[in-house]
Amino acid sequence: MKFEEQARAYRETIERYLASIYASFGEEPQKPIFEAANYSLLAGGKRLRPMLALEFCRICGRNPEEALPFAAAVEMIHTYSLIHDDLPCMDNDDYRRGRLTNHKVFGEGMAVLAGDALLTDAFAVAARAKLPEPGKIGEAIAILSECAGSLGMIGGQVLDIMSAQRACTEQEVLDIQSRKTGRLIVAPCVLGVIAGNGTEAQKEGAAGFASLLGLAFQIRDDILDVIGDAGELGKATGVDGDKNTFVRLYGLSSCEQLVKDYTARAIDCLKVFPDPSFLTELALSLTERKN
């Protein structure tokens, strides 16, 4: 199957699974929170993170759908982080993926709760995964928590806020973005290997690939904030001008080369897998993305 066909098939599988999560909760009194959560969860997007989980599971020799609970959990956590990022007390954004942000539609209080629900429910979804070795559920949950929590994505957000009023060093920017963006790309890759009953060497390869891909992804985001089209991005551009971004640190031309360098290094980490062609094409496609 060609790359685009496989990517489309993965997205369709992921969309169906995500749509089923809150639908299975029934007509509870808390239905408004399901609607608010679904508004953002089902808003589309690249579905990069869940796609990575499915492909790493497949490349380790298992049915990729066995990784769906992990894939969905990561996407739920990613979505909660976007809802909270958009709040007035954080980035104060009005648009996300071409439509009004969650708090603009449902109010700030409900948006906070929708994010909280997505984060909390994500762990229940992940815990339902049926692994070849059931004992590895605990390992998977621990990895997910660490990548999303104070040592991972949240930690990166904290460092970002703390450094907002000063210029950061190269190492500080790398540390912020490795946590803030990179760790939630590491999670689905490693969880996909766990779902696929992969080896320790494959877990390490997946983590290395994801860490480097995460940096390339963030640098491309920083580039698009400067040169991207707001219509294509589905959100405002130029909002990171005062932040400690890679573009501010290195300049546009150097960042374009850095994206290529980090992507090449990420692809090199895939040598422990039998057929990394899909992951290679996926990584390369991200270097030229417009949104």
Task: List each language-model region with its residue ranges.
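All-alpha prenyltransferase/terpene-synthase fold signal
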Residues: 1-291
